[in-house]
Amino acid sequence: IPRYKLQMVRTQRERGFRTYALSNINDVVFPFVRDVLFTQEGLQLDDYFEKAYLSYEMHELKPSPEIYRKMIEKSGMRPEATLFIDDNAENLHTAQELGFHVYMPRPREDFRFLFDDGPGR
């Protein structure tokens, strides 16, 4: 995970935005992601996200609407006030059907401009 993306998420959280992850991940890969990829800055996953919703814990996979509904219910988020970012069009289609604002970054795209944090703002 590029450091600027980790910092982008952390900056939004510091600004008072609620940040969540919804991931189709399994229990074998998750420890590596949590303990290696998210600790580059000496921080933990919880420093970036209020909560990580993980498919293997929720027993659902994106793009099933049910995993989104469970996340909405558990978090209290309002889809109409939430930006959902994903690199899979099917996942975004479901999110949009449920009322989320959506964005699909291009491969290697620096999308900090969405948050006025970087190049292209």
Task: Give residue ranges: language-model regions.
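Conserved phosphate-coupling serine/threonine residues in phosphotransfer and NTP-handling enzymes
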Residues: 23
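Short, acidic loop-to-helix structural element flanking the phosphoryl-transfer center
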Residues: 1-20, 65, 108
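Asp-based, Mg2+/Mn2+-dependent phosphohydrolase catalytic module
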Residues: 26-27, 33-121
